[in-house]
Regions:
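Conserved beta-strand hairpin/beta-sheet module of binuclear metal-dependent hydrolase folds
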Residues: 14-66, 182-197
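Active-site metal-binding motif and surrounding structural segment of the metallo-beta-lactamase
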Residues: 56-107
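Binuclear metal-ion centers of metallo-dependent hydrolases, dominated by the metallo-beta-lactamase
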Residues: 243-260
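Blade/loop signatures of beta-propeller domains
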Residues: 2-18
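Short, solvent-exposed beta-strand-terminating loops
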Residues: 104-118, 188-199
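Metallo-beta-lactamase
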Residues: 5-7, 52-54, 107-174, 178-248
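Residue-level marker for buried hydrophobic side chains located in beta-strands
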Residues: 46-48, 77, 100, 189-191, ...
């Protein structure tokens, strides 16, 4: 029974990237283990998060599906600067000078002035578990050990946000990292890792938090759920997992209950 279970777990990493149209201008790209969001309107295309460094070809493929080339990306917004969300943005910033924005409290992290990420030692302690072993191999294959940052990363201001495709509104959601930020665009909440609906390490599917080991402050994660619950949206585009529809308070309440 062990081999079929391992094969089932590994299958999560073998599917091709899926691009889901959420609204007229918002698309959720479902990568092998992480998501990113594309916002395309008459003013151009915006990316929210950028997958692992090794997800670059999948990111480019998702842009091509909408008729865009890498040089067409107006800007990249980071929900946070973990390598599975910042990864391909390193290349965009270096090769095309693409502006990369995040919350002011996350800029130093994006520049790699410091690293606020789960310790390799803590992962190693769990690597004997099948899910962790498979995820670890995938992480390494996608460049998850790269420590490069984005020297040009800058803080997103209200004025800048108003000029970007979809006019994204920043929603400060610290906890997973000190400067984690979600974005509300065209009625869709791009929540990054403040609120997810699935992950290769997790059996449960549905609104939830990532395991506490991955977050800077679990208490801040819970407080951020309370902040998200106040938003007027019924569409959740998470950093990991499936698109979720329904009152956002139902999602945050479910995640908070699981975290107790």
């Amino acid at each position: 029974m062990v081999a079929p279970r391992l094969a089932s777990m590994a299958q999560q990493f073998k599917t091709s990237t899926e691009l889901v149209q959420v609204t007229d201008i918002v698309y959720l790209a479902r990568g092998h283990a992480v998501n990113w969001v594309l916002v395309a309107d008459d003013s151009g295309v915006l990316m929210i998060d950028a997958g692992y460094p090794g997800d670059r070809q999948e990111v480019l493929a998702s842009l091509r599906k909408l008729g865009y080339q890498p040089g067409d990306v107006r800007a990249i917004l980071l929900t946070h600067a973990h390598v599975d969300h910042l990864g391909s943005a390193i290349w965009f910033a270096s090769e095309y000078g693409t502006p990369v924005y995040c919350h002011a409290d996350e800029v130093g992290h994006a520049k790699r002035e410091y690293l606020e990420q789960v310790a390799v030692f803590d992962v190693a302690l769990r690597i004997w578990r099948p899910r962790w072993a498979i995820w670890g191999v995938h992480l390494i294959s996608k460049g998850g050990l790269i420590r490069d940052g984005i020297p040009t990363a800058q803080a997103l201001t209200n004025m800048t946000g108003a000029e970007l495709p979809g006019r994204p509104m920043a929603v400060f959601t610290p906890g997973h990292t000190t400067g984690h930020c979600s974005y509300l665009v065209d009625g869709v909440l791009a929540s990054g890792d403040a609120l997810i609906t699935g992950h290769p390490l997790l059996r449960h599917r549905g609104p939830q938090l990532l395991p506490e080991i991955f977050s800077h402050s679990q208490q801040d994660c819970l407080r951020s759920l309370s902040a998200l619950a106040l938003l007027e949206t019924e569409i959740l585009a998470p950093g990991h997992g499936d698109l979720w529809r329904g009152p956002i308070r139902e999602a945050t309440d479910a995640a908070a209950a699981l975290a107790q």
